A protein has these predicted regions:
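Catalytic loop of the DD-peptidase/beta-lactamase superfamily, centered on the K-T-G motif
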Residues: 2-66, 83, 191, 196, ...
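Active-site-proximal loop and beta-strand segments within enzyme catalytic domains
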Residues: 4, 17, 21, 36-43, ...
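Secretory-pathway/luminal and periplasmic proteins that interact with or process carbohydrate-rich
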Residues: 54-56, 62, 122-128, 138-144, ...
Length: 472
């Protein structure tokens, strides 16, 4: 580590992008402790900031979102660095999910489509794509046969031929039930919809645009060999590096730490050329809760969700024989953590738990970047000017303001209360539709008198007027 920046020299990051020295020391200590106690041959973990957290207004997207600001590494088998590949395991699922949501946005499928629509004749045809994405379908965890992660993968025809109605462990939506098999089937849906192989889609639609040149289907040197650590005498057994075939969409890929940071940055701040930011936000809405006792863990559309106090972290863990991986981002701040170890699990704790601990450590020490307020360059005209100002509903005062950058009406209660402001923007037909807050998705209708003057705002039968004594 560089004494000036706390960064390994190979990252080449300028000092101003690194963590404060005390925070960097705490992160380094957590990683060193995890490697020693967990008995990992090597362990590497990086802290990143998405581009939105560091770039000024008007900055282009020539550099993919997400950049490492600190790297902590421990172990010597091999000595890790940010360009060395490890296997990312189930973090692969996040890429499969993004591809599927993009096909939905492009009109090639609907998330409520039954599987039968895309894989005709399957005995699991009533399961819906949304249920498979969110592990709410009740589908069994693994395909039949030998453990797919450690054996030669079957082709798609073999995977589909082995399906039976008995593959369901629970009725849909009964409970969260993690299913690798579900993502093998979703990969098949992608291939049927697009006519392209899953790997070609990943490479052309995701990796190439994000300049993730160190992410691959098979390992490319330099890469860390993966091991199982003997529980009694600490020796290493090298694990096979399998081609998982039709199950590849569930966990095949390899990546460097620097590349995984780019992907994490994308999940925090998506490039709209790849997927709409609103669609990525949709992926972060829980489909099923994995932890019904304390509601600290859930699953969205291809993304794990973890609550840590008042914060929610988005991402995914990954494991394949010989490897564990983690990706976790705090989307509001654009700060995230990615990491690898080349052992099949840590003796104490887990790599995803370590990642979230490090993320909390950084966020506790780092203030969330504040975007500067900038004055508007023009006074709103037309209907926008008519709608801004004070309004009343049921004796409560509200203010409607215009945000020109977002092109949104913002409705806030006065004085500010616990209910967040509602934002409205024009939909494709020109109507005002809610984009956030209590009225997300609702339509704001403007009432006018015979002369055309605005008299009221109607939001789902809640009528706002200029006079507190009027109710309609």
């Amino acid at each position: 580590m560089s004494p000036e920046t706390g960064l390994p020299p190979e990252t080449g990051l300028p000092p101003e992008t690194g963590l404060p020295p005390e925070t960097a020391r705490r992160v380094d200590a957590l990683v060193a402790q995890a490697q020693a106690v967990g008995r990992a041959p090597s362990l590497i973990l990086g802290v990143l900031r998405a581009q939105s957290a560091t770039a000024g207004a008007g900055a282009g997207r020539d550099v993919p979102a997400g950049g490492l600001v600190h790297v902590a590494a421990a172990g010597e088998t091999p000595a890790p660095d940010p360009e060395m590949q490890y296997r990312i395991g189930s973090i692969t699922k996040t890429m499969t999910a993004v591809l599927l949501l993009r096909q939905r946005d492009d009109g090639l499928l609907d998330l409520d489509d039954p599987l039968e629509r895309h894989l005709p004749g399957t005995p699991l045809g009533t399961l819906r794509l949304r249920e498979l994405l969110g592990h709410a379908a009740g589908l069994q965890r693994e395909p039949d046969g030998e453990w797919w992660e450690r054996s030669a993968g079957a082709d798609l025809a073999t995977l589909l031929a082995a399906l039976t109605g008995a593959k369901r462990a629970f009725p849909a939506h009964r409970t969260f039930h993690y299913s690798n098999l579900a993502y093998g089937l979703l990969g098949a849906v992608l291939e049927r919809c697009t006519g392209e192989s899953w790997w070609k889609l990943v490479r052309s639609r995701l990796l190439d645009p994000l300049q993730m040149t160190r992410t691959s289907y098979q390992p490319a040197e330099p890469y860390a060999r993966g091991y199982v650590v003997h529980p009694w005498h600490g020796t290493l057994r090298e694990e096979p590096r399998t081609d998982t075939g039709a199950m590849a969409p569930a966990g095949q890929l390899w990546a460097s730490l620097a590349d995984l940071a780019r992907w994490a940055g994308f999940l925090a701040d998506p490039d709209p050329e790849i997927i709409a930011p609103g669609t990525l936000a949709e992926m972060c809405v829980p489909v099923a809760m994995a932890d019904l006792d304390s509601w600290t863990a859930g699953y969205g559309l291809g993304l794990e969700l973890h609550r840590a106090g008042d914060r929610v972290y988005t991402g995914h863990g990954g494991s394949m024989p010989g490897y564990v991986a983690t990706l976790s981002v705090h989307r509001p701040s654009g700060i995230g953590v990615v990491g690898f170890a080349n052992a099949y699990g840590l003796r104490s704790g887990s790599l995803p738990m370590l990642g979230r601990q490090v993320l909390s450590t950084v966020l506790d020490a780092e203030p969330v970047p504040v975007r500067p307020w900038r004055p508007a360059t023009a006074v709103p005209t037309g209907e926008i000017a008519e709608l801004t100002g004070r309004w009343w509903w049921m004796g409560r005062e509200f203010e409607v303001a215009w945000e020109p950058t977002a092109e949104e009406l913002v409705i806030s209660q006065l004085p500010p209360g616990p209910v967040p402001a509602s934002r409205f923007g024009r939909d494709a037909t020109g109507r005002w539709q809610g984009r956030s807050g209590w009225n997300d998705g609702e339509i704001l209708s403007v009432r006018r008198d015979r002369a055309g003057a605005v008299t009221a705002l109607d939001i789902a039968t809640f009528v706002f007027t200029r006079d507190p004594d009027r109710l309609d």
